[in-house]
Amino acid sequence: MPFSNSHNLLKMKYSVDDEYPDLSVHNNHMAKVLTLDLYKKLRDRQTSSGFTLDDVIQTGVDNPGHPFIMTVGCVAGDEESYEVFKELFDPVIEDRHGGYKPTDEHKTDLNADNLQGGDDLDPNYVLSSRVRTGRSIRGFCLPPHCSRGERRAIEKLSVEALGSLGGDLKGKYYALRNMTDAEQQQLIDDHFLFDKPVSPLLLASGMARDWPDARGIWHNDNKTFLVWINEEDHLRVISMQKGGNMKEVFTRFCTGLTQIETLFKSKNYEFMWNPHLGYILTCPSNLGTGLRAGVHIKLPNLGKHEKFGEVLKRLRLQKRGTGGVDTAAVGGVFDVSNADRLGFSEVELVQMVVDGVKLLIEMEKRLEKGQSIDDLMPAQK
């Protein structure tokens, strides 16, 4: 748990060598960047809310690596963190986001009409489609650093705003503290709710403090539009449904997200955003669009093929296990989504998923017949 602010002056009594973390066995982006010299340069800085370098890196110190994905190993505690600790964050962002430079500008496109196709992904292979993003409310600290009062204020504000949604987005808020364990587990199993805070990344960064205080889920009546409140980000906005109509999912996502932003503005709150980093979120891996468009897809043959990883890489896609980031694939079902978040617009990322998934299905059909997929190998996108 972060506690460095109160101890930062105490730490200064010890030399840089005494305080520098042992990163010798680490495989994360932070550990690649944080040299002794950089630690020395940044260790006495803090943001105006008191977030320090040790708060930024603690999750990456405590979690050397991950078997399935290269983790980032650092978090922001407020909007200022990305500026105050830019000498650490900029190279991490460049490394994680495919060479995104400190001078680059991000683009946003939430017009679902610009998406080509996507309403006809084969439902025999695509079990469900989902698009999610995160949003942070300007003026509050982020989850690794916010106080109980801030968290409760974010919950109150969000529930009031979401309560104004109408039509097929009309819904209700369910606070975690009012749910039984069984109700919570059912929502988790149905992929509607975030897991209980057992992930070491959540725990070490301090995001799980005071759990389940001021956490909850808001969803519309048919559970196709959901908002998680106060998990890894202030808000996680999710549009999802069974089958392969990604166009419908993305259209609902854009409509709902735009309405939510308007409702917050009417209360004089805006989302954290800047021209360079796009939407500001807790984890540097989610900067930019914060968008992950994913499908649960059955690929029992391609999933075992030696070229599966290379195909995904060329399509700028990534795979996760069936149950999400910390899990393995079950029954040949993978969670396949865009690998990028920053430097591409929302429409461009969903387009990559739609086009890529069509090719994956074509390859799977070939392999079912025992045929080669060599001529289908895509060029690098």
UniProtKB/Swiss-Prot annotation:
InterPro entries attached to this UniProt entry: ATP-guanido_PTrfase, ATP-guanido_PTrfase_AS, ATP-guanido_PTrfase_cat, ATP-guanido_PTrfase_N, ATP-guanido_PTrfase_N_sf, Gln_synth/guanido_kin_cat_dom
Entry keywords, A to Z: ATP-binding, Cell membrane, Cytoplasm, Kinase, Membrane, Mitochondrion, Nucleotide-binding, Phosphoprotein, Transferase
PROSITE patterns: PHOSPHAGEN_KINASE, PHOSPHAGEN_KINASE_C, PHOSPHAGEN_KINASE_N
Tissue specificity annotation: Expressed in almost all tissues and found enriched in various region of the brain, retina, heart, gizzard, gut and sperm.
Pfam assignment, any one: ATP-gua_Ptrans
The protein's Enzyme Commission number: 2.7.3.2
Every Phosphagen kinase N-terminal domain range: 11-98
Class of enzymatic activity (EC top level): transferase
Domain Phosphagen kinase C-terminal: 125-367
Protein's UniProt keywords contain Cytoplasm: yes
CDD domains linked to this entry: creatine_kinase_like
Residues with the Phosphoserine modification: S285
Modified residues (Phosphothreonine): T282, T289
SUPFAM superfamilies assigned: Glutamine synthetase/guanido kinase, Guanido kinase N-terminal domain
Subcellular localization(s) per the UniProt record: Cytoplasm, Cytosol; Mitochondrion; Cell membrane
GO MF term set: ATP binding; creatine kinase activity
Modifications made to the protein after synthesis: Ba-CK and Bb-CK are phosphorylated.
Domain of life: Eukaryota
Sequence similarity: Belongs to the ATP:guanido phosphotransferase family.
Functional description taken from the UniProt entry: Reversibly catalyzes the transfer of phosphate between ATP and various phosphogens (e.g. creatine phosphate). Creatine kinase isoenzymes play a central role in energy transduction in tissues with large, fluctuating energy demands, such as skeletal muscle, heart, brain and spermatozoa.
Protein name (Swiss-Prot/TrEMBL): Creatine kinase B-type
Species annotation: Gallus gallus
Lineage, opening ranks: Eukaryota, Metazoa, Chordata, Craniata, Vertebrata
Chain's gene name: CKB
